């Protein structure tokens, strides 16, 4: 009690530096930041940006934690629609997967969180913004780049990074002040949002170690296999099993379904924004299901060169977003191309769900380029004759034929 009273007195006496907006999750690192920044003379206003990863009960707990560790005020922003409209829609339409496996669950949120924190900071008349990222991960880059672009006039304060604070040090600091340590403070760093859940720490640091069985095996009480139907308009899902549902609501519904089946669990190893390798575990069933279904519908309606160039640009888009470069103008150009490419990506996909896996088993579209009335692969067609096919095959062989002749030095006539 004495330590808490001393801390409260210190915060009152040292508020000379003015208001500061702190991106706040209610976790250990940001809980540490509140009293630490108050000791440094800031009036700390916490900002929780809901990107789809919390229940009403969890948001209430975050509010209580902010007050308990000394926040001057606490602000909640519902950014689920913004995350979907600004980021997730292009990750679906672009089929964006990092390393072909991971759907950028965290990168899809961080820039929006920075945007919302800046808006709140300006409304408060804040002189600075702060976040609780360490100096070893991608989030510090994502936050810092966004904050510098959006609000170059505001100071960026990062106590965890600047002081090199470890988790055990943060716990000891809060305990010394008599302040509550978040109940989930432990060996893992967990991020849950609209586009999936990730966790790092423990087994993720050993590339030979695997996750606990409960994070790999399907739930023992998983439902029986079933099929669902997704309706699509211009590359975005608009209905589930005939019921109109779109945006964050549809993603959340698919997330609940896939979680029950244990769908979407995986491990990703990749390059970080800092150039080192990193490893995480993730569960992102809705993201993987939507991207998988969308890709199959695209195969039905896009030409091969549309698909080829979309794939290249989708990978580049995901790479830039992953590394905090959302504001690069080239991404707006890519978004325009992606949007244009989706003009005919309308139809339905039928998806079979089973414990631990899913499969797209059917697609249909009014714009389907697979027309069995004029051609059936491997069987018959009405678009060309056998002689025309023979001539086409002969011409198609020319580049490779010429390369082979050049390689062995022969000059035999191609007509012989």
Please report, for each region that a protein language model flagged, where it lies by residue.
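Nucleotide-activated chemistry modules centered on ATP-dependent adenylation/adenylyltransferase
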Residues: 8-416
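Basic polycationic patches enriched in arginine
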Residues: 2-4
